[in-house]
Swiss-Prot record:
Active site (catalytic residues): E305, C339
Organism: Arabidopsis thaliana
The keyword Transmembrane helix belongs to this UniProt entry's keyword annotation: no
Listed EC numbers: 1.2.1.3
Catalytic activity: an aldehyde + NAD(+) + H2O = a carboxylate + NADH + 2 H(+)
Protein name per Swiss-Prot or TrEMBL: Aldehyde dehydrogenase family 2 member B4, mitochondrial
Coiled coil: none
UniProt main location, coarse: mitochondrion
InterPro entries registered for this protein in UniProt: Ald_DH/histidinol_DH, Ald_DH_C, Ald_DH_CS_CYS, Ald_DH_CS_GLU, Ald_DH_N, Aldehyde_DH_dom
Top EC category: oxidoreductase
Residue sites binding NAD(+) per the record: G282, S283, T284, D285, T286, G287
Function description: Possesses activity on acetaldehyde and glycolaldehyde in vitro.
């Protein structure tokens, strides 16, 4: 039940009305209160809400202790609402990765965690989930402050799912076992499912806590130890979660957390000879680098969850109002900063014009502002680099002669707020239809028939997710099977239950996270063959 409740907050379906987290307050976001609030830097400063949470952990977590980086260096983590410094955190580098890997190796080879009964490991994960719920407001505040996503999204959707994921993996801890295999001859054969060892994990900035759970949960349930590198933009919630894990009774060295930059700390972790497994979520280009570093070191196995350019297909039989709302959610959720965002909206030619007009109207009603305010649907982009990238793609769309229906500009002159932007008359060869923008930019394309849209939807290097909106079950089944994507949502989108596997085809990555399949990422399978002398039953 908990999973279904959380999923309903993160999805849109035929039967649902506008979700509570993202409901419009009926204001025009371009000529109403938002521009008045963000029209000048002074007005923006007056309206900014200061979260009550204290930033108490900014050091690296190594071997059960919060410590400074070996170099003593720090770097700032910034508030996306203003671009101002929230706190300075320890800047880990290769030496700190070495320290963390050494702690994780010792904890795996000599510590109690892998030898602990699976039931006892599950109890630690359950205690951690309880502590997450106890400190949900602090975690949600830090997540929103560091990332810019709406506070209500953090508090009522992401934190409950964060706790749910760890309870899910706690349930798996004592159900991981091998098989007895009938083999020819006088032999008894069974398999052992053993923890893989020291797992290196690199998480992104768009969903810091959820990606923490997707990786840390299965690794711990299987009995591994971990070195986790945070995204440099969003280190704060990982450190807070690390503190809660220590309170829950996780032994020292089992979970080590290093903040730092990809070129230094990330590269050192990916190429480390004493790391047995690597998991990475981020861009496809960086994923290629990570895979190369892993291959050129000790050939450690790598799980990759990478970029996407997901098609969202609206057929002519669709309820247009519901399809517009779902397509809007599929793209604009989390400021458009979702790897699986429905960023290519394909609409049948018979309903195209109506769909475009209603999509424009919905975007104009989207409430953009300080994510700590009630009723806000969209906060700022994560940082200046991402802001400039999105604005570059908007300019490209205009120059490519796509029709700019609305948006396309910055809101205010402080922070990284972008108007919800809708393009129509988009062609497949335009950059806005090919590249992962990772921002609030909806591209609406026209199609004529099923075969055509299947072909066009699959003509991308990505294959992470897709959405299909139709009342026809035959169409839904046909298209779902034909699309080359790791997840296909039919009449819904962004449904993320703890048990549903997630991962990509093609250049969207390999392996699966969440669900039973994620356990395979962190297990070694050993076959044990024993000769039998005069077995009674042969």
């Amino acid at each position: 039940m908990a999973a279904r409740r959380v999923s309903s907050l993160l999805s849109r379906s035929f039967s649902a009305s506008s979700p509570l987290l993202f409901r419009s307050q009926g204001r025009n976001c371009y000529n109403g209160g938002i521009l008045r609030r963000f029209g000048t830097s002074s007005a923006a400063a007056e309206e900014i809400i200061n979260p009550s949470v204290q930033v108490s952990h900014t050091q690296l977590l190594i071997n059960g202790n919060f410590v400074d980086s070996a170099s003593g260096k720090t770097f700032p983590t910034l508030d996306p609402r203003t671009g101002e410094v929230i706190a300075h955190v320890a800047e880990g580098d290769a030496e700190d990765i070495n320290r963390a890997v050494k702690a994780a190796r010792t904890a795996f080879d000599e510590g109690p965690w892998p030898k602990m009964s699976a039931y006892e490991r599950s109890r630690v994960l359950l205690r951690f989930a309880d502590l997450v719920e106890k400190h949900s407001e602090e975690l949600a505040s830090l997540e929103t402050w560091d990332n810019g996503k709406p506070y209500q999204q953090s508090l009522t959707a992401e934190i409950p799912m964060f706790a749910r994921l760890f309870r899910y993996y706690a349930g798996w801890a004592d159900k991981i076992h091998g098989l007895t295999i009938p083999a020819d001859g006088n032999y008894q054969v069974h398999t052992l499912h053993e923890p893989i060892g020291v797992a290196g994990q690199i998480i992104p900035w768009n969903f810091p806590l959820l990606m923490f759970a997707w990786k840390v949960g299965p690794a711990l349930a299987c009995g591994n130890t971990i070195v986790l590198k945070t995204a440099e933009q969003t280190p704060l919630t990982a450190f807070y979660a690390g503190k809660l894990f220590l309170e829950a009774g996780l032994p020292p060295g089992v979970l080590n957390i290093v903040s730092g930059f990809g070129a230094t700390a990330g590269a050192a972790l990916a190429s480390h000879m004493d790391v047995d497994k690597l998991a990475f979520t981020g861009s496809t280009d960086t994923g290629k680098v990570i895979l190369g570093l892993a291959a050129n070191s000790n050939l450690k196995p790598v799980t990759l969850e990478l970029g996407g350019k997901s098609p969202f297909i609206v057929f002519e039989d669709a309820d247009i109002d519901k399809a517009v709302e779902l397509a809007h959610f599929a793209l604009f959720f989390n400021q458009g900063q979702c790897c699986c965002a429905g960023s290519r909206t394909f609409v049948h030619e018979k309903v195209y014009d109506e769909f475009v007009e209603k999509s424009k109207a919905r975007a104009l009603k989207r409430v953009v502002g300080d994510p700590f305010r009630k009723g806000i649907e969209q906060g700022p982009q994560i940082d200046l680099k991402q802001f400039e990238k999105v604005m570059k793609y908007i300019k490209s769309g205009i120059e490519s002669n796509a029709t700019l229906e609305c948006g396309g500009d910055q809101i205010g002159d402080k922070g990284y707020f972008i108007q919800p932007t809708v393009f129509s008359n988009v062609k497949d060869d335009m950059l806005i239809a090919q590249d992962e923008i990772f921002g609030p930019v909806q591209s609406i394309l026209k199609f004529s028939d099923v075969d055509e849209v299947i072909k066009r939807a699959n003509e991308t290097k990505y294959g992470l997710a897709a959405g299909v909106f139709t009342k026809n079950l035959d169409t839904a089944n046909r298209v779902s099977r034909a699309l080359k994507a790791g997840t296909v949502w039919v009449n819904c989108f962004d449904v993320f239950d703890a048990a549903i596997p997630f991962g990509g085809y093609k250049m969207s990555g390999n392996g699966r996270e969440k669900g039973i399949y994620s356990l395979n990422n962190y297990l070694q399978i050993k076959a044990v063959v024993t000769a039998l002398n005069k077995p009674a039953w042969i």
